[in-house]
Amino acid sequence: MAFFVPLHPNIKTMQKVIGIGETILDIIFKDERPRVGEYDSGLQPIGAVPGGSVFNGVISLGRTGINAAFISETGNDRVGRKIIQFLEDNHVDANSINVYPESKSPISLAFLNEKNDAEYIFYKDHPHDRLDFVFPEIQADDIVMFGSYYAVNPVIRQQVQGFLEYAQEHGAILYYDVNFRASHQNEVVKLNANILENLEYADIVRGSKEDFEVLFNKHDAETVYKAQVSFYCKNFIYTQGSEPIEVRGAGGFSRQYPVAPMSTVSTIGAGDNFNAGFVYGLIKKGITREMLVTGLAPELWDALVGEASAFSANVCGSIHNSVDEAFANQKKRELEVCLKEKEENI
């Protein structure tokens, strides 16, 4: 069994974050990069960074001082070793990473368009995916982040579902980022049961406008919430790029949050770090599962969406998939002050 040593040993009440998802090496290209010389193909990458939907958010949380761990799989190669080292360098427990000696670690090619939105091509060589891991220690109000195709993949569904049930039984807060790509649209019917189960496990569901158009052919937050989400989960976040964020919550909460204009270098990690900022806010504000069930006060929702938006904006300013060091250090200091004040008031 993997145990987690708190990064702040003097603060005994800090919630842990456990992410479960894919690991991948993102090789990033800029479609509009000017060619230099007659023989320049215009295809030279502008960067290569470890990534994965939940992975990116967990890295940001590790950088901000959150006690974080990650469950995933890699191949036994240079890419896999780089990914594990990257987790450890960013203070994320990597003890639950499966290394398969017969497999190659996955990579993706990400092509940024003129708006710096990414189009992906994925390459994966895991012929026998099985996700064999020992469940980490989970206590009440720890936070589990899951999502993307990894959370509905039939090949590893039994293991993922078993972990989600274990986390739920132990009182964890489950945060589900739907993140369902159009490339899997032909599998929607086959995966529908897994998607609905995930909605039922979740205490918080976040998805983008594109996710729900692909999954349910529905085009606005209110319709998605009432028709597809609210029966399973009352706390719902609907993002739509530069358009306002829509939030629905237990107790009838409903609010729209404008997205501040920003110049972007890459939007690859925008949604992933929105998730990270929201989870950071849950810990900073001491949100419990019981509070989510009964309904959060409007000012708490405001604070959570504010943190989520700040994390997302920061990561859009570079080609990296997680928040930068200066931002992370600032958030780490804020968290330490906040948790210390709470400890003194106990």
What are these regions (language model features)?
Residues L61, S208, G271:
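Short, conserved phosphate/pyrophosphate- and ester-handling motifs at nucleotide-, phospho-/glycolipid
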Residues T23, S53, Y149, V178, ...:
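Active-site metal-binding loops of divalent metal-dependent hydrolases
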Residues N67-S148, R333-I346:
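Conserved N-terminal subdomain of the carbohydrate kinase-like
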Residues V152-K226, E243-P244:
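Conserved beta-alpha-beta core of the PfkB/ribokinase-like small-molecule kinase fold
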Residues P6-I18, A221-I346:
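Conserved phosphate-binding/catalytic region of the ribokinase-like
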Residues E137-Q139, N198-L199, S230:
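A short, aliphatic-rich alpha-helical micro-motif
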Residues F3-V92, K342-I346:
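Glycine-rich phosphate/adenosyl-contacting loop at the front of the ribokinase-like
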